[in-house]
């Protein structure tokens, strides 16, 4: 009887001591000023810290919460809200920016547009060739067992037929459904009409509307760290780390090809074009664009990030407001790698010998198919059966490769989107620099000046 009594007294005494301490602290009158001081310090730190560092902090917190408290499903809501907000505003931003840019466009944009379109298509083809070579050097097989249900395009004609259909679809529905092919087409048409018929005041209203939408986008981007926190938490809590062991070789080949394209192939092409060290631009685009695209897994959601980066680097608004959304549609380096590697993995698994001419034809088909993947539900993965048909592989077997793609999609799709979307900004900036006679090193001055202005 004595022990419980003593324990009870000790517990009560501890509670009383804690209560007295709290009351004494509150009565001292120092609580509010100290709390206010802490809050001001946190706000000052938040404002002075770069967005990239904030995102990295969000990533770390997301990983920790995902591993330790996976049952906190409400955290994932932060990511869904962030991506949803970006996806909701991005089509509107593209529509008003493109229409306004075309309406105000002067001379000198033609050369840059030709340059950036060449980069988009050429690098996508080279990425497919890199994937072919890597698949020959490091052949990977996958276990093909059960058939997978799903629908995929029957061929290139189906892909481009859908693209044309989407292009001339209802413009309001195109904005509502984030159909960027339709948004681009109708925005260009409206912009041309404004250029020839509208007065200066009307065009200025469109420009003001673009500024308003851009302001809303910037507000959304300020919440990127919380959004990334939610996205990382969702991936870690749902998928864990098992995807690095199952299908590890296939995933390593895919990621390796994409990293090689991003860090070696694209910089080499830019170096030959600019005759200068390309890596100052490459690193900026990877840091400012690829990181966010990796976690949002949506090129469309990353359009505002790319436009914000181009604006900070003094790229002409008339140029980037069209080239960035266009790149979201046809710049598909990562998609070309995915389609090529997965198709050749199926061939290796079935013992199908792929000749060099067939491999080159596959590269071309994957390039054309990848450029249309933004118009296909499921993206690059559902274009795998189309490429497999080149080797006489039936749809049931090819769809099993699609299923494998969805299993490793947490990483594959993230890296693919990062490569695709950061390339949009990269080639836009390169084309603009070349037209102005500047070099990649010049962007360091712009960013350093921006940092001084923030301070």
Role assignments for model-derived ranges:
Residues 102-111, 196-200, 239, 275-278, ...:
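Juxtamembrane helix-boundary/capping and inter-helix hinge elements in multi-pass membrane proteins
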């Amino acid at each position: 009887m004595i022990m419980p009594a003593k324990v009870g007294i000790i517990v009560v005494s501890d509670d009383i001591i804690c209560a007295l301490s709290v009351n004494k602290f509150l009565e001292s009158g120092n609580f509010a000023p100290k709390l206010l001081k802490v809050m001001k310090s946190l706000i000052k730190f938040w404002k002075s810290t770069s967005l990239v560092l904030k995102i990295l902090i969000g990533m770390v917190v997301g990983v920790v919460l995902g591993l330790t408290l996976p049952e906190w499903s409400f955290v994932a809501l932060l990511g869904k809200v962030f991506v949803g907000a970006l996806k909701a505003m991005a089509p509107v931003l593209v529509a008003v920016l493109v229409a306004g840019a075309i309406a105000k466009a002067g001379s000198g944009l033609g050369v840059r547009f030709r340059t950036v379109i060449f980069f988009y298509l050429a690098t996508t083809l080279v990425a497919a060739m890199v994937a072919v070579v890597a698949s020959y050097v490091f052949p990977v097989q996958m276990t093909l067992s059960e058939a997978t249900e799903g629908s995929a395009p029957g061929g290139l004609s189906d892909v481009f037929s859908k693209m044309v259909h989407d292009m001339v679809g209802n413009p309001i529905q195109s904005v509502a459904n984030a159909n960027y092919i339709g948004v681009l087409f109708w925005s260009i048409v409206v912009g041309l009409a404004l250029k020839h018929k509208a007065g200066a005041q009307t065009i200025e209203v469109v420009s003001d509307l673009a500024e308003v939408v851009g302001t809303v986008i910037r507000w959304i981007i300020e919440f990127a760290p919380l959004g990334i926190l939610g996205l990382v938490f969702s991936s870690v809590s749902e998928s864990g780390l098992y995807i690095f062991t199952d299908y590890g070789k296939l995933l390593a080949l895919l990621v390796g090809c994409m990293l090689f394209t991003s860090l070696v192939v694209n910089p080499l092409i830019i170096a030959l074009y600019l005759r200068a060290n390309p890596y100052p631009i490459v690193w900026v685009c990877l840091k400012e664009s690829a990181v966010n695209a990796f976690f949002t897994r949506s090129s469309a959601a990353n359009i505002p990030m790319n436009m914000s980066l181009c604006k900070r680097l003094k790229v002409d608004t008339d140029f980037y407001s069209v080239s960035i959304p266009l790149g979201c549609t046809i710049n598909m380096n990562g998609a070309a790698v995915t389609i090529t590697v997965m198709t050749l993995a199926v061939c290796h698994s079935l013992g199908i010998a792929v000749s060099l001419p067939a491999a080159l034809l596959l590269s071309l088909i994957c390039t054309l198919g990848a450029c249309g993947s933004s118009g296909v539900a499921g993206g690059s993965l559902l274009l795998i059966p189309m490429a497999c048909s080149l080797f006489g592989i039936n749809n049931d077997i090819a769809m099993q490769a699609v299923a494998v793609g969805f299993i490793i999609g947490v990483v594959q799709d993230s890296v693919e989107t990062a490569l695709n979307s950061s390339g949009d900004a990269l080639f836009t900036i390169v084309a603009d620099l070349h037209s102005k006679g500047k070099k990649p090193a010049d962007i360091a001055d712009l960013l350093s000046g921006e940092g001084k202005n923030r301070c």
